[in-house]
Amino acid sequence: MEVNILAFIATALFILVPTAFLLIIYVKTVSQND
């Protein structure tokens, strides 16, 4: 069970980190367009 939890956390971070990075770029782009 512990291994599954760690794998879930690792997967969540692997998905959330790039997503957050893309969102930051998107927000900056929209702000520049205004």
UniProtKB/Swiss-Prot annotation:
Entry's transmembrane regions: 5-25
Alphabetically ordered keywords of this record: Chloroplast, Membrane, Photosynthesis, Photosystem II, Plastid, Reaction center, Thylakoid, Transmembrane, Transmembrane helix
Transmembrane helix found in the keyword field: yes
Localization per record: Plastid, Chloroplast thylakoid membrane
Gene Ontology process terms (BP): photosynthesis, light reaction
Electron transport recorded as keyword: no
CC per GO annotation: chloroplast thylakoid membrane; photosystem II
Function: One of the components of the core complex of photosystem II (PSII). PSII is a light-driven water:plastoquinone oxidoreductase that uses light energy to abstract electrons from H(2)O, generating O(2) and a proton gradient subsequently used for ATP formation. It consists of a core antenna complex that captures photons, and an electron transfer chain that converts photonic excitation into a charge separation. This subunit is found at the monomer-monomer interface.
Family membership noted in the UniProt record: Belongs to the PsbM family.
Subunit structure comment from the entry: PSII is composed of 1 copy each of membrane proteins PsbA, PsbB, PsbC, PsbD, PsbE, PsbF, PsbH, PsbI, PsbJ, PsbK, PsbL, PsbM, PsbT, PsbX, PsbY, PsbZ, Psb30/Ycf12, at least 3 peripheral proteins of the oxygen-evolving complex and a large number of cofactors. It forms dimeric complexes.
Protein name: Photosystem II reaction center protein M
